[in-house]
Amino acid sequence: MALRLVIAEKPSVAQTIAAALGVKGKQDGYIEGGGYLISWCVGHLVQLAEAAAYGEQYRKWQLDSLPILPEEWQYAVDPDKGKQFATLKELMHRADVSEVVNACDAGREGELIFRFVYEAAGCKKPMRRLWISSMEDGAIKAGFASLKDGRDYDALFASALCRAKADWLIGINATRLFSCLYGKTLNVGRVQTPTLKMLTDRDAAISHFQKEKYYHVRLDLSGAEAASERISDKAEAAALKGACETETAVCVSLTREKKTAAPPKLFDLTSLQREANRIFGYTAKQTLDLAQALYEKRLLTYPRTDSSFLTDLSLIHI
């Protein structure tokens, strides 16, 4: 009997998928039954190898060894997760497994996590893609009823791989360069360094801020209000106020319009993080971790997204 190997991003997600599909046979590192083998990645099982993997000359941080530009990129299995990788590799190469389903999170990072394992394991079997944004049983079953060809997501993987390689090239080379020049470890990153620059600029602006007094002239027109723009000169503001007090306001035009205010859109990850920080003081990572945990408990739709819309299927369940 041909089996379908399903690989989720985390054990908890694998267990949820197994429950939805009625798969109950727990094994060491996977769940088996009903024509399925369901296993998991435990996050980033495989990553791009460190610089030393490309030659002993890169083991020490030296200026004359820079830049480090791999011609053929290598993968490295997280040493703390080697057992689970070995399990996945063995499952992928089982003779009775006919295809492998990528059930990692429906996003760029989920695609990368699966593909790195798939490629590092040397798997050549057909790939299918489970693309769902809800962990409800109905959404899972519907997703398996309409699995996509894994190669349809090659562009998404290319995007994730490009990001990973850019992080590696900038992080490895720039960190070594500036650390050697500075004499101490000075971490440089594609995202963290520009972000640090923004924080530095903001801190400098606050430090050099000069208080400036300004004035507004406000009119109360029996139900309607009007205000001038900022006026820095007190005498000018007083003159405008005096001129208004000696004249009669006349309404020369009145337009009435009916407007419909649309309800606010649902949260995407960025707006959720911003609001959680404003109300609760949570960091971006705290919000993401909490949202991910709620998603895995089927209380939120998939949080790692920049979309503020629901699928028709998600709407039904919500």
Report residues per predicted region.
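Intrinsically disordered, low-complexity regulatory segments
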Residues: 1-164, 168
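Long, highly charged, low-complexity internal segments
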Residues: 37, 45-78, 90, 183-292, ...
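Conserved ATP-binding/catalytic motifs of P-loop helicase motor domains
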Residues: 126, 196, 300
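Amphipathic alpha-helical segments of the small helical/lid subdomains adjacent to P-loop NTPase cores
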Residues: 159-189
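A short, conserved structural fragment
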Residues: 296-303
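Short, Lys/Arg-rich nucleic-acid/phosphate-binding segment
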Residues: 304-308
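Short, basic-rich loop-to-helix N-cap that marks the start of a DNA-contacting helix
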Residues: 311-314
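Conserved small/polar residues in nucleotide/adenosyl-binding loops
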Residues: 316-318
